[in-house]
Amino acid sequence: MYFPNDCFVSMLTGVDGDRSSEVGLIGSEGMVGLPVALGIGVSPFRAVVQGGGTALRMKIVDFRREFSESVALKRELFLFTHLLMIQIAQTAACNRFHTVTQRMARWLLMTRDRV
């Protein structure tokens, strides 16, 4: 598990072998490694650091132990999961219906929110 402090990480999904598309952007509001932390063996996403900086790292076994014992951590994880699903849905709609200029503006605003 990685917890970005002052960097941001793109979540990419593979398309047609070697191509990919960004489906999410994670900054200090979230964590990288959510599927694995939830017990899913492999994440369907590839994480790429887009804006350099620092992040905290936690072993999955330690995260799962804390998750099983902490109501507050569960609440935060569920909230983050919900917000990430909203972001993924918004990204899909934007990629389908917006112009390149609008998509770039959205991406710039999202990166600004995360630094």
Give short role names for the model-derived ranges.
Residues 1-51:
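Cyclic nucleotide-binding regulatory domains
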Residues 56:
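Conserved active-site beta-strand element of glycosyltransferases/polysaccharide synthases
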Residues 51-52, 67-115:
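Polybasic "coupling" helices that flank or enter modular domains
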Residues 31, 63-64:
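A generic structural signal for short hydrophobic patches within well-formed alpha-helices
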Residues 19-20, 64-66:
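A short local loop/turn or secondary-structure capping micro-motif enriched for an aromatic residue
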